[in-house]
UniProtKB/Swiss-Prot annotation:
Annotated TM spans: 7-26, 30-52
Protein's organism: Archaeoglobus fulgidus (strain ATCC 49558 / DSM 4304 / JCM 9628 / NBRC 100126 / VC-16)
Subcellular location: Cell membrane
Record's protein name: Uncharacterized protein AF_1457
Keywords associated with the record: Cell membrane, Membrane, Transmembrane, Transmembrane helix
Length: 105
């Protein structure tokens, strides 16, 4: 969460309070309860958005961690498969040489 997010949150809360006050003053029916609850509503929405952003950042960090783990595991798996493949190819070459020797005798 950046300082920019906090500043924008504070601005949205104050602007909501000012907007509701101005709107109600047009009809000469300024009610502080309505202004308070409108401000509370905007504050809760702002906090909800900030909480969603923080949750998304945590999920992205987890994805990056999983991606690193998969990369390390795939490198290890590639090495093991390559060693196994080389071993099997050597066995196959030895068997082919053995068959060729028998054929030429």
């Amino acid at each position: 969460m950046d300082a920019r997010d906090i500043v924008l949150s504070v601005i949205s809360v104050f602007s909501a309070a000012a907007l509701v006050y101005r709107w109600l003053s047009l009809y000469d029916r300024v009610d502080m309860t309505v202004i308070f609850f409108a401000t509370l509503l905007i504050a809760s929405l702002t906090l909800l958005l900030i909480s969603i952003e923080l949750r998304m950042q945590r999920i992205m960090d987890e994805f990056k961690s999983v991606k690193r783990t998969i990369a390390v595991n795939s490198d290890d798996l590639e090495g093991r498969i390559e060693r196994l493949f080389i071993e099997k190819v050597r066995d196959l070459e030895d068997k082919l040489e053995s068959i060729e020797r028998r054929m030429y005798r």
